[in-house]
Design a protein with these regions (language model features):
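Alpha-helical transmembrane segments of multi-pass membrane transport proteins
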Residues: 1-499
Length: 499
């Protein structure tokens, strides 16, 4: 084997050594790229003019309109965390589901899905629900392990439910439409939420001491929950029915018909709304997030806005909501801007480092080496997918999803392209798998977020063990996505709005 063939594996090995040594990822990528670039030039196996393309690549990163969505969604998530949205939803839904065993856990899953569809940021969801719900669940006798697991699992829904930042990054790296990725993610999102609900119901039925119902004294609106729940369910059915009928109308008429149907149904339910304070609070707490979901997600799905434009509208909506709740202050704005700037700088530096590494790696024919290795795996497409899923799962135990997306995904995509695997479906598999990276010990970020806000009586072991069933459920969804490839792709291609 000559030196030219050794360069790609040596580059990869050097990167692994740097990362395991604890050096920052961005600088590790850049250092390996620079060192091996000059080494390749000295050995006459790397064309020096390629390095001249680096400034253009960096300019391309800085001018990428799609990546602007990341700071927008991050800023929106931090503002919403301070706006009182989570508190209102958790309080109202907790009272609504309170009479049921496992009702508080069901409300946490429901609110987790709503927060995921509005913010797309995991940290905000974990900390909000950990601060608000966990003490209440423990107060009324919930098992600490089960309560911690429900909060962890529900918070990670922000990884797969649009407008997830993960899906934006995956779309950018794979070169697929964000709108299509969002549409494809609706199926695993629904499956994940459904499995969470089923798991909570299972625990409530077979381990009732782990998830008791709220006592009557903890429910000021006792006796009104069933009516409020029925009314909210009827809204859902009316909305879905109107949407199904509206599929035969133009896009603008379709959404107008849905809004009109919900408005008429509100008039029908007006006597209930007047007499039932719990129903009023539930509707008032649901309207702001639903408006935000339409601004952020609905406009992307129906093609009215790009993810960047939707993120900008979401920021405006979050600021208005925080102002209406009297939670907007200079301190809140400063904290949101600081957090957004830090994450954006982190992402940009990793992108610059990974671009330099990729430029040199491909310049020494590393892409051919990766393609040969991945396509040579036993089992063909099945063997490749299995290898990638195991690799992503293991990487998720140790490094952040940004690092996986910017370092590993471009290399793995080479094999997917060589095997003619649909990039959208492949990206969706990786996205579902990346959910687990927030829950897997020892470095799952959600575990640390919850540990920081959990009461002292909750042991670290309870937090770690509580997340394991939800890792299993997420992997089960991954299996479903694998076997539902054709239905998912047909759903995306056939998901028109307005016929």
């Amino acid at each position: 084997m000559n030196l030219e063939n050794l360069m790609p594996p040596l580059m990869f090995l050097a990167l692994v050594v740097f990362l395991l040594s604890g050096y920052p990822v961005a600088f590790s990528l850049g250092a390996v790229g620079i060192v091996f670039g000059f080494l390749g030039i000295a050995l006459d196996i790397f064309p020096a003019p390629l390095l001249k393309a680096m400034p253009d690549r960096i300019f391309g990163i800085m001018s990428n309109q799609l990546l602007l969505a990341i700071p927008f969604f991050t800023f929106m998530g931090i503002i919403l965390e301070k706006s009182g949205l989570a508190e209102d939803l958790l309080d109202t839904m907790g009272k609504l589901f309170g009479p049921l065993r496992g009702g508080l856990a069901l409300s946490v899953v429901f609110v987790g899905a709503i927060l995921a569809a509005t913010t797309g940021v995991v940290a905000a969801s974990v900390m909000a629900m950990g601060l608000i719900s966990l003490p209440i669940m423990l107060k009324y006798g919930y098992n600490p392990r089960f309560a911690s697991g429900v909060i962890l699992g529900s918070a990670t829904l922000a990884q797969i439910i649009p407008p997830s930042v993960v899906l934006i990054v995956l779309s950018d790296q794979l070169g697929v439409s964000v709108g299509d990725m969002y549409k494809a993610a609706l199926i695993p999102s629904a499956l994940t939420v459904g499995f969470y609900f089923l798991y909570v119901i299972y625990v409530a039925l077979f381990r009732p001491k782990w998830a008791p119902a709220l006592p009557p004294e903890a429910r000021p609106d006792a006796g009104k929950e069933a009516q409020a729940a029925f009314a909210l369910l009827s809204y859902l059915l009316v909305g879905v029915g109107a949407y199904a009928v509206g599929r035969f109308l133009p896009a603008w008429a379709e959404w107008l018909e849905v809004l009109l149907a919900l408005g008429i149904w509100s008039l029908v339910l007006l006597p209930w709304i007047r007499k039932n304070p719990l129903l009023r609070r539930a509707l008032l707490s649901m309207v702001p997030p639903l408006v935000l979901i339409f601004l952020v997600l609905g406009t992307v799905l129906i093609g009215l806005a790009t993810p960047t434009e939707a993120g900008a509208m979401g920021v405006v909506g979050a600021l208005i909501l925080a102002a209406l709740n009297r939670r907007l202050s200079f301190k809140v704005l400063y904290g949101a801007m600081e957090g957004t700037a830090k994450l954006t700088a982190f992402v940009i530096f990793i992108l610059i480092g990974s671009t330099l590494f990729s430029l040199v790696f491909r310049g020494v024919n590393g892409d051919l080496w990766v393609e040969g290795f991945l396509t040579g795996l036993p089992g063909g497409e099945v063997g490749f997918i299995l290898f990638v899923m195991v690799l992503v799962f293991l990487l998720g135990c140790f490094i952040d999803f940004f690092e996986i997306a910017f370092i590993a995904l471009p290399l793995l995509a080479i094999g997917a392209e060589a095997l003619n695997i649909d990039k959208l479906w492949f990206g969706l598999l990786v996205g579902v798998n990346l959910q687990t990276s927030f829950l897997t010990p020892p470095f799952g970020f959600s575990l640390f977020y919850l540990r920081n806000v959990a009461p002292k009586e909750v042991k670290t072991a309870d937090i770690y063990l509580g997340g394991i069933p939800f890792i299993g459920l997420q992997l089960l969804v991954l299996v479903f996505v694998y076997f539902l490839r054709e239905p998912i792709l047909r759903f995306v291609s056939g998901m028109g709005f307005g016929g």
